[in-house]
UniProtKB/Swiss-Prot annotation:
Subunit structure: Part of the Tic complex.
Family: Belongs to the Tic20 family.
GO BP of this protein: protein transport
Swiss-Prot/TrEMBL keywords: Chloroplast, Membrane, Plastid, Plastid inner membrane, Protein transport, Transit peptide, Transmembrane, Transmembrane helix, Transport
Transit peptide: 1-49
Changes seen on gene knockout: No visible phenotype.
Localisation: Plastid, Chloroplast inner membrane
Protein name: Protein TIC 20-II, chloroplastic
InterPro entries: Tic20
Pfam families in the cross-refs: TIC20
GO cellular component, one term: cytosol
Tissue-specific expression: Expressed in leaves, siliques and roots.
Membrane-spanning ranges: 61-83, 101-121, 134-154, 172-192
Amino acid sequence: MASLCLSLHQTLTNPLSAPRCRPLSLSFPGSSTFSIRPSSRRATALTTRASYTPTPATERVISIASYALPFFNSLQYGRFLFAQYPRLGLLFEPIFPILNLYRSVPYASFVAFFGLYLGVVRNTSFSRYVRFNAMQAVTLDVLLAVPVLLTRILDPGQGGGFGMKAMMWGHTGVFVFSFMCFVYGVVSSLLGKTPYIPFVADAAGRQL
């Protein structure tokens, strides 16, 4: 009795010294022997390694060049803003040589549009990253043609009425939106990220 109490006292005070549980075997007549083993739970540290593949420089350059198409075509909407704030034109002086070269080519806008759509968007040899950026730029360029069509249809006139002021506000808003999309697309492409322009990205994604 004393030895039993001593063994129980050692087990309670030092659990590590307690004997390990042995598997319990149950044998039934005419059947196999079942062995029940105690489950041991061990805390395992899960290490998640995030694989990151940087975007190649060529894909970034093509994406940046794609967003230049709608931006160049949207400069015509900024004429009222530049006339009211001439100093804003100084910010765009570095791109004037490229813009003059772009406008010196006959039908440069149509050539760039179809070249970008057929040569990049529909070219499966390019990655989805490049094709999506190109399609988003093409979609934005198509949307930029809508204000011109509305202006020709409505014909606000040359006076200082409400129609003319509405056209000026609309053109200025279109230019600001296009400029923000251009900056957003260029910065995202430089960082190797995918820019998602509201409404435009959904329409571009459905075309791929």
